[in-house]
Amino acid sequence: MSKQPIITSEEVRGVIRNLLDSTLSAAREANEFEVGRVVDAADGVAHIEGLPALMASELVEFSNGTFGVTLNLDEDLAGVVVLGEFDGIVEGMDVRSTGRVLSIPVGDAFLGRVVDPLGRPVDGLGEVPHETYRELELQAAGVMQRRSVHEPIQTGIKAIDTMIPIGRGQRQLIIGDRQTGKTTIAIDTIINQKDNWSDPEKRVFCIYVAIGQKGSTIAGVKRVLEEAGCMEYTTIVATPASDPAGFKYIAPYSGSAIGQHWMYQGRHVLIVFDDLSKQAEAYRAISLLLRRPPGREAYPGDVFYLHSRLLERCAKLSDEMGGGSMTGLPIIETKANDISAYIPTNVISITDGQIFLQSDLFNANQRPAVDVGISVSRVGGDAQIKSIKKVSGMLKLELAQYRALEAFSMFASDLDAVSRRQLDRGARLSELLRQQQQSPYPVEDQVVSIWVGSNGYIDDIPLSDVLDFERDLLEYLRNRTSILDDLRTCGDLTDALLERLKEAVESFKNKVYFMRVDEREKDPLEDENIGQEELVRSRRAN
């Protein structure tokens, strides 16, 4: 009986081949990154050498665990912006390439959370589960992947929805001096999306990117959104003023990456950049430290590209791409109402319109302090709801004429009856557009309010009583008629609905409002209120 060999030669060769493959694979894994060293480091920027294969925007890791992103690629050196604490970065420190372009985790779990520009939680609620990673420097959607803006996104603010409408996928700039209500408009717009959250077709995912804001301001925004019940559909990307310039530079791109993830899933996104002036200043500081040649106002030559490649990501996608959208509300802070400065003119030329907030109007208690003369929406009119478009057609012109006539009347000794009526109508329309913050108006309420003002139903109402008249009228229509419900359902102010509205307004005004006024005037007054009542009566007589 012959003995069979235990192992054949082919089996031996196979074992050796597998061993060599595993050894080479382990060697490749052990050497998958290169190691360089820091040549110099100062003010949040480090120059490194020994990494010739670095890519633009590649993430590098210093030996102390701090990350940085490559912005400059020279022949021998690479300029890296440190993303995190800079104190531990010293000359001679090892730094390794990661082979990854700067990216952040994204997913639905980010709703209701506060994260930093790297997607790390800063709200103390633990890690954020993520679905995937998304690069920060991805190309925006191409021309053939888009469609025109045709769906409205309601802010709940009468002055904006009627005269400066915004559509889904639009980029609408909010610009004005500090402390004029820019952030308030953005936050009110987020709050107004609450009613749509229960409808999967209408729901809007909101992102608030705080760039260089005070920590107390960011905490205040979060508190307002929590109290309004809006954090469940909102993500806050927080970059306080104490953060390094690198974080302020990448924060808007991080927010847009989170939003693009939802947009390409066919969802609708609203993103607020508060504000891009501080991002431009951070980028200027980084560029000067990287020894890039300065240009106008010491900004680098590519500062326009900084904002254009960011805001171009806001779009309304075609049906073939899922039909999602990302609406951008960038905020720019001006100095002394100068919108002709470098950064404001750049962003105005990139966006699809601007809402200009005037400090004089704000100080005169006209809030929101929208200057309708130079505020414009270039594409939002195509998305405006029919009923609002019908009632607000001449509103912007009337208010612009009122502002001009008001300025003229300061120097005129006497005005004719037509001019005086125009002044009275304009004053009441301006009063009608005043609105408290965090109190958005539904579309149907806006339609009734503007229609009543434009058709002279408040011309004989004392100026101080205009908002009370509006509140009581809307309450009357809500409780006694179905007009508001029909307006909301129909979306158009039909002839039949218009006749019903006329009858209801006249009935309220004659049978309810004036009866209440008469009863109020019959009530006995306290001694200290008699003088005030005489003043009110004299105003009505005039």
Curated annotation (Swiss-Prot):
Gene Ontology terms for molecular function: ADP binding; ATP binding; proton-transporting ATP synthase activity, rotational mechanism
Q: What is its main location?
A: membrane
Positions of the record's site feature: Required for activity:
375
Task: Read off the Gene3D superfamilies from this record.
Answer: 2.40.30.20, ATP synthase alpha/beta chain, C-terminal domain, P-loop containing nucleotide triphosphate hydrolases
Residues annotated as binding ATP: 176-183
Q: By its UniProt entry, which SUPFAM superfamilies does this protein fall under?
A: C-terminal domain of alpha and beta subunits of F1 ATP synthase (SSF47917), N-terminal domain of alpha and beta subunits of F1 ATP synthase (SSF50615), P-loop containing nucleoside triphosphate hydrolases (SSF52540)
Where is the protein found, in the record's own terms? Cell membrane
The chemistry this enzyme catalyses reads: ATP + H2O + 4 H(+)(in) = ADP + phosphate + 5 H(+)(out)
Enumerate the UniProt keywords alphabetically.
Answer: ATP synthesis, ATP-binding, Cell membrane, CF(1), Hydrogen ion transport, Ion transport, Membrane, Nucleotide-binding, Translocase, Transport
Q: Subunit structure of this entry?
A: F-type ATPases have 2 components, CF(1) - the catalytic core - and CF(0) - the membrane proton channel. CF(1) has five subunits: alpha(3), beta(3), gamma(1), delta(1), epsilon(1). CF(0) has three main subunits: a(1), b(2) and c(9-12). The alpha and beta chains form an alternating ring which encloses part of the gamma chain. CF(1) is attached to CF(0) by a central stalk formed by the gamma and epsilon chains, while a peripheral stalk is formed by the delta and b chains.
Q: What does this protein do?
A: Produces ATP from ADP in the presence of a proton gradient across the membrane. The alpha chain is a regulatory subunit.
Q: Which HAMAP family match?
A: ATP_synth_alpha_bact
Q: What is this protein called?
A: ATP synthase subunit alpha
The organism encoding this protein is: Tropheryma whipplei (strain Twist)
Gene transcribed to yield this protein: atpA
